[in-house]
Amino acid sequence: MEKKKNIWVGKIVVIVLIIVSIGSYYVFPSVKHVMNQVFKMFASGDFAVVRDFVASYGAYAALISFLLMIFQSIAAPLPAFLITFANANLFGWWQGAILSWSSAMAGAAVCFFIARILGRDVAEKLTSKAGMQQIDTFFKKYGKNTVLICRLLPFISFDIVSYAAGLTSMSFISFFVATGVGQLPATIVYSYVGGMLTGGAKFLVTGLLILFALSALIFMGRKIYMDRQNKKAK
């Protein structure tokens, strides 16, 4: 009974926050202007645009970056690596890595609890039905390892994985630990690259993305092979 009550309270709080956020967008011109800037910034695909936007807030730049990372997590699949590059370029690679990692963890937690509290319908509206079904297949095949595997695949929105994990029986602690471990290597590499990134470094970024994809495919291939061997042994 107490658990059901807590779930309903959680639903009410989340729904109120969503209503207030949407209402603010339409009622306050300044909020609408900033939000339109944010969407345009992500749509540009240019980390320099993101960097300049964050830097424009001066002493509050780190806070704005933190909130941006949470926002892009909720509004999947906006590209998180743009923020990671911008953070490293603005604050230095290791300081940027800490900021990007911690804010991504916060964003993942928010997505997880949105799905757990509000359910599948809301999660699919914030992402896509096809995307959620794709991740469902991963969870059926690899279980809790899905969080680690998908973190290695740069072409899969990890935010969708966070939503999908919230719909499973996976505990938050297990999800949070797997998320922290899984995203750390990519965050460090992206931050290191972002710290020295210029407009002419697109080929380097592309090469890194391909490297991550190949690493993930090798990992998945090994996992599938081991699963088949275990089945044969049984």
Located regions from the model:
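Pore-lining and gate-forming transmembrane alpha-helices of multi-pass membrane transport proteins
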Residues: 179, 194-195, 203-211
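Core hydrophobic alpha-helical transmembrane segments of single-pass membrane proteins
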Residues: 14-20, 211-216
